[in-house]
Amino acid sequence: EEYKIPALTSVPVRSLSEFFLGAEPIWYDIFTNKIHKTNHLQKTKNESFKPKHVLIIGAPLTGKSTLLKQLAVESKELGSVLYINEITPEKARLLFREIKNSQENVYVFIDNAVDSSEAIQTLTNLPNIKIIAAERDFIYDTVSYRFSSQQFNILDVSGLNDFDIQSVIDSIPQGINKQNDSFSHDEGDMNIEPSFLEVMTHVIKDNSLADRFVDALKEFKKRAAPEHDLLLLSCYLYSCRIPISVDIAAAYLRSYDYDAIKAFKMLSSMDTFLYPYEGQLSDDNQAYYVPRSRTVSEIVMRKTYHKDMAKMLETFHQEVSPTRISRYDIFKRYAYDAKLMGRAFPDWEQGLSFYEEAFTRDRTHSLKQQGALYLANKKKYELAFIWIDEAKSITGNNNPTIRNTYAVILFNANYDKPNSPDVLLTLEESMDILQRCYNDDYRKIYHARIFAEQAIKFKVKYPDISKRKGYLELSMKWLESELKNRPNDKWMNRLTRTIRRNLK
């Protein structure tokens, strides 16, 4: 029952404007039938009739969750329909038994597919089930081996065609101020279909949800430090795909002498920005909350003053035990991201101290890997090598993502040094490692992109040797192969054009 699509009479009502300003779609938005159904909906529906399961991918704010909900509603006429935002392996095994015993055809729609990948593998063993799942493209790229081509058809839904663009613009509610009534391809990359986010950014004049969050943080900082800290923490946790609980809030606000009751009242009072959360990551003993959009949370993290970010991160990881975090296994995949820490800790010594402290709680290769990337980004290559070597010692030499990171650090550490036989050998070694990663691993796009970026730089430093080695030609071959399945991938399209220019 918990995974069935709710009835219209039971869902919260809100203005559709919230959706167009950046909030995540809710069932009421879908039931109004006022959100344009793009051509990707029909394509995904057609794929769902084929033997394989379907995984739709795309950049943030490209309409994946909206499409998934729209298709779930339309599929009710085909059989039993379930919609899942997250599901634990244990719940998946229970669901497996229920579906197996029912013997009816069941369509299961799963958002945030990577977080539920173990559960998905359990459910795919049933012959009477069809899974249609969604995930962000860059997250899928790093774990694509979990969704094999034997089981899944992959659909990229990032781009909008001309008809969809104008239909989306025409469906924007009257209450939202527009600065444009159309979108020209001149506004974006003319060779790539624009995304929903690009169209909205060009057309809508009103403050986005992200701007409202940032403005609220500034106001809270002036007059109410606890509210500022709690809202920023909520954004951090949701960017890590975890809700904030009263338990976490009370532990975090210990220095303000807040107990659970005070923390609950504060979370409840911020209903303009935080929604009550009742999903799989919650329990019945306390209240949970999430910001109105994960993408908005990530934008807020990028726009927040770095000292505020650093203070929040250090306080959270000192005061909040991992045992208080529901699905810590999901949280830790995103919690120590090198780019995020690079913004929070511009001083590398402070950042190193943060990672060293974090490793006392989370002794995994992935944390060491992120620490190595952070240090490499700060050009502390000797320390970065120590950290990535320690990651390799934890996993052995068989983890392609660790080998990929080692190759990247090796290349960047030596690239700016004066040309010499030793420098050349290290750059060639890096390229060789990436070639082996590409050949040995299912995550082809992940390795092809890094190889292409390095091939372009290699040609600048050693043009004659680059030509003899054929790095650019090999990059072009790999990228063109991947673009057949991802024609609107902006990163790969830009890399392909750059390589083409370098080959002339």
Region spans (language model):
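Winged-helix-like regulatory helical subdomains adjacent to P-loop NTPase cores
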Residues: 2-41, 60, 199-263
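Walker A/P-loop nucleotide-binding motif
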Residues: 49-68
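Alpha-helical repeat scaffolds
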Residues: 310-317, 347-358, 382-394, 419-438, ...
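"A position-specific structural signal for the A-helix of alpha-solenoid helical repeats
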Residues: 333, 369-370, 405-412, 446-457, ...
